[in-house]
Design a protein with these regions (language model features):
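Class I SAM-dependent methyltransferase SAM/SAH-binding core
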Residues: 19, 23-79
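A short glycine-rich, Lys/Arg-flanked "PGG" loop and its adjoining helix->strand segment in the class I
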Residues: 102-117
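Conserved class I S-adenosyl-L-methionine
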Residues: 117-145
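Short alpha-helix
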Residues: 142-165
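Conserved catalytic loop of SAM-dependent methyltransferase domains
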Residues: 163-188, 196-198
């Protein structure tokens, strides 16, 4: 995977995605951000959150990660984080190469707080790059590409509200830098004429928890209930206090 992103086509793809991630993540606020996948690229660099964490399956995958963030070796389908503990989760080309993409999305929903954000990028099955899947037997052409509308439906079922979606990279999947430059004009034309045919897509969703109510802590100390009088005192009050008052009134009248 990391070697492909060092090719001219991979660098072209990462440059487009990095620019979109920088714009999206700069306006998402919180404390804890998690990037799942593409550890060799710091997609969280524009995030203002103080804690950046990236997942890696093995120590070899961790070797190329950015030094400014923490790295956790784990299975993406079973994230080692408590529920409602993260404010941002980035899934970078993970759904199309995961054996359980639904479980991966459920994990993202579990670890996110209410109003937390998930940003997902994936390859578009309806672009010109789809033909490479039949002629090239290596990453990233071996994945099971998912369309943006399908992932949007999955997010809706999990309680997310999709805020925005973008398509990009309309140049054919050529490996030559010279030919990439010649086809560069398709990026401008593709955005205007056939926007949903870009090679990649990016979705931004927000986790909604409808009916949630904030409960403020009760900092006031509860007062102890007043102690009731003993039964003997109550009987004396009922039997002896009233006659005493009556006798005093009668004494005053006399």
């Amino acid at each position: 995977m990391s070697s492909w992103f060092q090719t001219p086509l991979g660098e072209y793809l990462i440059a487009w995605e990095q620019a979109r991630f920088d714009t999206m993540l700069a306006d998402i606020f919180g404390y804890n951000a998690l990037q799942v996948g593409l550890g060799q690229v710091d997609l969280l660099r524009a995030s203002r959150m103080p804690l950046h964490v990236c997942t890696a399956r093995t120590a070899r995958d961790d070797a190329g990660s950015a030094p400014s963030r923490l790295t956790v070796a784990c299975d993406e389908a079973a994230l080692p984080f408590a529920g409602a503990s993260l404010d941002l989760v980035v899934l970078a080309h993970q759904l199309e190469f995961s054996a359980t993409p639904h479980q991966l999305l459920r994990e993202a929903a579990r670890v996110l707080v209410s109003e937390g954000s998930v940003v997902i990028c994936g390859f578009n099955p309806y672009s010109l790059w789809r033909f490479c899947r039949y002629t090239r037997n290596r990453w990233p052409w071996r994945g099971r590409y998912l369309s943006a509308p399908k992932v949007r439906d999955w997010l809706t079922v999990l309680g997310f509200e999709v805020q925005s979606s973008q398509y990009g990279c309309y140049v054919p999947a050529v490996e030559s830098p010279e030919w990439l430059g010649r086809w560069k004009w398709l990026d401008h034309v593709g955005r205007r004429c056939w926007p949903v045919c870009g090679a990649v897509w990016i979705l931004h969703g927000i986790k909604r928890v409808y009916g949630a109510r904030l409960i403020q802590p009760n900092w006031r100390e509860k007062r102890a209930p007043a102690r009731s009088l003993p039964a003997v005192a109550r009987k004396l009050g009922e039997a002896g206090a009233l006659p005493d008052k009556v006798s005093r009134k009668e004494t005053c009248k006399s």
